[in-house]
């Protein structure tokens, strides 16, 4: 009887491989890793739930996190593009904002796996490698640094990394999210990395831009003044 077609038991078939360099304990390591995946999925689900609610409530289309003039200039870099409607740069601005936010969250999850509070470029590379929708960035983001850092989650057995090029597992986004979740602060750029506040705030406070402080490090708003400055550039 041919045994090559035998299927593994459900408990083994449903376990995704952990990230490269991840260390788990020999006893209960699989359950611990599944719990980590569930927590990460809940955080991503909370992020997208809040973003959908925010988009539905938007009534200000004049001020944007990213300058529309810069986006329009990038769009016009394509010689085949002759005319651009007023709505197109607005949609691109929001799409770029969501792209940056999601990649930041996924990068922060990798930093937390490595017990760090500093988001580094190797975290961004890891987030790109483990997420198939970001595979178009693989060739422009160095991945060698991922191998240099061992993610220590506890003493025990080191699990072998997955095959190169295979995106790591995340549960489908459609799964219901449980309560709670990770919260991160606004990123502050620094030559040595992106410093992120510990997860102690609510999701709403994470993505809202404070208006009354002078030390706000969130992305600058586009507005008419920003557009005028960019239009004046060569």
Curated annotation (Swiss-Prot):
GO MF annotations in UniProt: DNA binding; DNA-binding transcription factor activity; protein heterodimerization activity
Pfam families xrefs: Histone (PF00125)
Location of this chain's protein in the cell: Nucleus
Principal place of residence: nucleus
Family the UniProt entry places it in: Belongs to the NFYC/HAP5 subunit family.
Function in brief: Stimulates the transcription of various genes by recognizing and binding to a CCAAT motif in promoters.
Composition-biased stretches (Low complexity): 209-219
Biased composition (Pro residues): 7-20
Subunit structure: Heterotrimeric transcription factor composed of three components, NF-YA, NF-YB and NF-YC. NF-YB and NF-YC must interact and dimerize for NF-YA association and DNA binding.
Residue ranges, compositional bias (Gly residues): 220-234
Keywords, comma-separated and alphabetical: Activator, DNA-binding, Nucleus, Transcription, Transcription regulation
Tissues with expression: Ubiquitous. Present in etiolated seedlings.
Region of interest called Disordered, as start-end residue ranges on this chain: 1-20, 205-234
GO biological process: positive regulation of DNA-templated transcription; positive regulation of photomorphogenesis; regulation of DNA-templated transcription
UniProt source species: Arabidopsis thaliana (Mouse-ear cress)
CC annotations in GO: CCAAT-binding factor complex; cytosol; nucleus
Gene: NFYC1
Protein name, per record: Nuclear transcription factor Y subunit C-1
């Amino acid at each position: 009887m041919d045994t090559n077609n035998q299927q593994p038991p459900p408990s083994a078939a449903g376990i995704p491989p952990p990230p490269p360099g991840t260390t788990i304990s020999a006893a209960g390591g699989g359950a611990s890793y599944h719990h980590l995946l569930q927590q990460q999925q809940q955080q991503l689900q909370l992020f997208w739930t809040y973003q959908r609610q925010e988009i539905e409530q938007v009534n200000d289309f004049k001020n944007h996190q990213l300058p529309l003039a810069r986006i329009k200039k990038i769009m016009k870099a394509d010689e085949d593009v002759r005319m651009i409607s007023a709505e197109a740069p607005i949609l691109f601005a929001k799409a770029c904002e969501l792209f940056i936010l999601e990649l930041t969250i996924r990068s922060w999850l990798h930093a937390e796996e490595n017990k760090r509070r500093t988001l580094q470029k190797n975290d961004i590379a890891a987030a790109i490698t483990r997420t198939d929708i970001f595979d178009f960035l693989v060739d422009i983001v160095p991945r060698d640094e991922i191998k240099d850092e061992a993610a220590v989650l506890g003493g025990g057995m080191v699990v072998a990394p997955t095959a190169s090029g295979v995106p790591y597992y995340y549960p489908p986004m459609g799964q219901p999210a449980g309560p709670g979740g990770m919260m991160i602060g606004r990123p502050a750029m620094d030559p040595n990395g992106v410093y992120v506040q510990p997860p102690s705030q609510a999701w709403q406070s994470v993505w809202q831009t404070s208006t009354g402080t002078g030390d706000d490090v969130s992305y600058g708003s586009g507005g008419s003044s920003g557009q005028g400055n960019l239009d004046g550039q060569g």
